[in-house]
Amino acid sequence: IAVSSLALALAACQSMRGPEPVAQANIPQSYTASASGTSVAAQGYKDFFADQRLVQVLNLALANNRDLRTAALNIQRAQQQYQITANNQLPTIGASGDVLRQDQGAGAQTRYNVGLGVTAYELDFWGRVRSLKDNALDSYLATASARDATQIALIGQVAQAWLNYSFANANLKLADQTLKAQLESYNLNKKRFDVGIDSEVPVRQAQISVETARNDVANYKTQVAQAQNLLNLLVGEQVPESLLAKQRVTRITSNNTIGSGLPSELLNNRPDIRAAEYKLSAAGANIGAAKARLFPTISLTGSAGYASTDLGDLFKSGSFVWGVGPSINLPIFDWGTRQANIKISETDQQIALSDYEKSIQSAFREVNDALAVRQNIGDRLSAQKRLVDA
């Protein structure tokens, strides 16, 4: 009978959590535009980016960025929280000792006690502690995946800021050259006006062009300063001048043939999707813990040690004492609190499911956007070159 009861309890433990919901992201089997080549997920940033100055800047950012440091500390915190929750599956053993002097009417006595005890070890028949452990593990894995997502986002932000600084510098130099040309044109028109060859109209027009060019120079100086400030913030320290690109960067990646992959690969390659999936799993574990609270909490308490009224006889064989016993606790009427907790956990799971589906859809959109830009980048570059030549 005891074995059957234990088997029934273990079966109940396994059924508390319930089935995991199935995500309905509704994404196509292929992208609107595709590209063949090496998957970017298989490349590290050191191989992906061609300019070694950018690679060194990224190394500094990964070592010093405060957001990434916070994400790493969150992992440590989640890991310790998981360890605490996992330890709840094991009994807590403590040592105790006391001396009691009392008088119960027959003369004062001194009693000495020393021993070991197990304090309220919960027998997890319904899987409550196990569900809490699963929740802590999934939360830890979600935090680790979120840190990976933060790192990938940081790499993209630093690379973009580094390139923006390069472009702003190139535009500033072009604006300086334009200003010099406009000043030369103004001086020429001023001389022609002074000797009476031309009217004042060309002088005024040239002066307007000069002031416009000066305004452009001031704007681009501001852009250079802002780009450098943002880059320093992302990196977490002042970026050395030797690592900054003063000229326009013409080659960004080492490999011009980057494959798009398949939408199904996003689930494994995107850490933000993995983080959302782990959060969904953690929400499911919370449901199991909430349902387990509907059943009695059974705890075991035990102790063993020595007790004597004479300190010299404390550790003799006749002074050994022990005790063990279970306790059971079941709230009879709690005004629906436990049922409400289950409903809250189920709602949290639906929220996590919605977030998971959104993360898949957002990732799919981001890939499609990048492919759309890449598909038309050749036409845009050709148009820009023709515009410059004209």
Region annotations inferred by a language model:
Residues 129, 145-262, 373, 377:
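Periplasmic alpha-helical coiled-coil/stalk elements that build and connect Gram-negative outer-membrane
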Residues 94-128, 132-146:
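Outer membrane beta-barrel translocator domains of Type V secretion systems
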Residues 35-36, 40-49, 54, 59, ...:
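Small/polar, glycine/serine/threonine/aspartate-rich low-complexity segments that form flexible
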Residues 69-87, 96-100, 281:
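Short, acidic/charged, Gly/Pro-enriched secondary-structure junctions
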Residues 15, 123, 160, 236, ...:
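Short, conserved catalytic or interaction motifs in soluble domains
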Residues 1-63, 133, 137, 221-268, ...:
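Terminal intrinsically disordered/low-complexity segments used for targeting and assembly
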Residues 69-70, 86, 123-151, 201, ...:
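Sec/SRP-type N-terminal targeting helices
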Residues 51, 64-67, 122, 157, ...:
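Short loop-to-helix capping motifs
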